[in-house]
Regions:
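Bacterial Sec-dependent N-terminal signal peptides
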Residues: 1-22
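Glycan-recognition patch characteristic of GH18 chitinases/ENGases
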Residues: 22-156
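Short, well-ordered coil/turn segments that N-cap beta-strands
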Residues: 24-25, 52-54, 118-122, 160-162, ...
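Substrate-binding surface in catalytic domains of secreted glycosidases
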Residues: 28, 32, 38, 71-89, ...
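Extracytoplasmic/periplasmic, Sec-exported soluble proteins
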Residues: 48, 99-107, 140-148, 158, ...
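A generic secondary-structure signal
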Residues: 111-114, 151-158, 196-200, 275-279
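Mobile, glycine-rich extracellular loop/lid and propeptide segments
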Residues: 123-128, 159-171
């Protein structure tokens, strides 16, 4: 999926993820940097209702071939995470793909400053669908893992964030240059980041979280060493959406809570959570389920309906604004 499609189909404005156990302990929300440009910058650090969340996940930073991490959009990333740039800074500064210099920004309206003033944490997510093609080679190299972990610590230092989220889509996924060794190398990568954050925790005197996003198809879950990984992570963020879409020959629910009348076994939120808990022993209090604030539209070969033959194309005529993806927008 290309970046433009990814914007439409996956992380919209905020997609809360709610802990499977009750009562709910964690409500996180993605802040995609590219959405800052939309609708006159309507979604910005000053417009967020922080009281609704415990954590804001800022998406996404880019893993580089050498294992380092860089901003994907340095202008948006520096402005949103550090605040407005001060007058008189070098003209090329904002566009440079480094983490930035906090001394050159007014942090009064930064996402981090605003969130912290409301008791909300901020973490940066590294990767995402279009930025996952370097993870396999990074995870396979001890030197690249070290450099990756060092970059994670630098992001904590520069931005004052509360942790790191890893969004590798997906270990073992050939389309994103995955390999059979990813299952084991992903564990090594998480261990390197956790060890590095632990060392920084000791210096700073506060906990730094580590979370990761996971595909929930049974084949995706099988590519993770859960018994080892679960102890390294504070939160396991399940991508319980995009179960079905235009890659399927028949129409179905995008993000079903329970198993649809027709469809693949295990392709629903309830089954995914039970599978993770019962087969792999993951504790419920670490699991966050993802809620999709969008739907799917599909052109059909005959009459519109559920479980009917699809032309595998979105209905951009009915839903032109977001590439054929109907999505929830609260009144402004």
């Amino acid at each position: 999926m290309h970046l433009r499609q990814f914007l439409y189909l996956t992380f919209f404005l905020f997609i809360p993820s709610l802990l499977a156990a009750q009562p709910c302990r964690e409500v996180s929300a993605y802040f995609p940097s590219w959405k800052w440009y939309n609708r006159g910058q309507l979604v910005n650090p000053a417009s967020i209702h922080y009281e609704k969340y415990t954590t804001i996940i800022y998406a996404f930073f880019k893993p580089n071939p050498d294992g380092s991490i860089s901003p994907f959009d340095p202008v948006a990333d520096k402005t949103l995470l550090l605040g407005e740039a001060a007058p008189g800074i070098p003209r090329a500064y904002l566009g440079k793909k480094d983490f930035g210099n906090p001394d050159w920004h007014n942090d009064r309206n930064s996402l981090v400053k605003r969130a912290h003033s409301e008791g909300v944490k901020v973490v940066i997510s590294v990767g995402g669908w279009t930025l996952s093609d370097q993870f396999s080679s990074i995870a396979a190299s001890a030197e690249k893992r070290r450099r990756f972990a060092h970059s994670c610590n630098e992001m904590v230092r520069v931005y004052g964030i509360d942790g790191i989220d890893i969004d590798w889509e997906y270990p073992g996924f050939i389309t994103n240059k995955g390999s059979a060794d990813d299952k084991y190398n992903f564990t090594h990568l998480l261990q390197a980041v956790r060890d590095s954050l632990d060392a920084l925790e000791f210096q700073r005197g506060r906990h730094l979280s580590l979370s990761a996003a996971f595909g929930v198809a049974p084949t995706r879950m099988a590519e993770i060493e859960w018994a080892k990984v679960v102890h390294l992570l504070d939160h396991i963020n399940l991508m319980t959406y995009d179960f079905y879409g235009n890659s399927f020959a028949t129409t179905n629910h995008n993000a079903p809570l329970y198993s649809p009348e027709k469809g693949l076994n295990g392709y629903d939120t309830h089954s995914a959570v039970r599978h993770l808990m019962e087969r792999y022993g993951v504790p419920s209090w670490k699991i966050n389920i993802g809620l999709a604030f969008y739907g799917r539209s599909l052109k059909t070969k005959g009459a519109a309906g559920l479980h009917v033959s699809s032309r595998q194309l979105p209905d951009t005529k009915t839903f032109p604004e977001d590439g054929g993806t109907p999505m929830f927008r609260p009144p402004t």
